[in-house]
Amino acid sequence: PSPAKEVARFHQSLPNYAITPLIELPEVARELGIGRLFVKDESARMNLSAFKILGAAWAVAQALTDGANPADIAEVKAAIDSENKPTLIAATDGNHGRAVAHMAKRLGLECAIVIPDGVSEQAINNIAGEGAEITLIDGDYDEAVELAKEITATLDHAIHVQDMSWPGYEQIPNWIIEGYTTLCAETDEQLRELGKHISRCTVVEIEEHTSELQSPEA
């Protein structure tokens, strides 16, 4: 199977997986003077209110299986050394940390999340609700990432699952990006089901953690 198909197959093995709605907004498209406008509604993705679980889940699965492209979550669980279970570490300002913590809970792993100043109480509670150990800092996101690096270095068995890269740390961020291909694959299939060819489209992430697809032609 193609990489995107392997990613989608894995996501389909996760509890609560379902294709999220693609909603057409014809009146808004007319107001904007474009052919067609679609909103990919990620507000109910796996009951986590954001698409970030797609990237975090695949990155965690790949990290735990040494990049074996696991077919399902059972294969990931089987790869975990019960005597040396790793701790998942991440810095976050919201949904990424919750997604990493959710995967840790699903896999029976400990999780430590570093949260910078300015994150809402609701977001913090959501992450804590997934069972993560929370560290709040009086600093910005970059400082949170640095502390997450330090925490990872102090532990014998830890995996830093960060959605940004730096020299020497590229593989996990790349896996996170691969995870998002499921969203694109779903959208492609949903557009095909409309029965009309979309010759060109633009993808825009908007604040409510959805993706907007706009096509210049009908």
What is each model feature region?
Residues 1-211, 215:
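PLP-dependent amino-acid enzyme catalytic core
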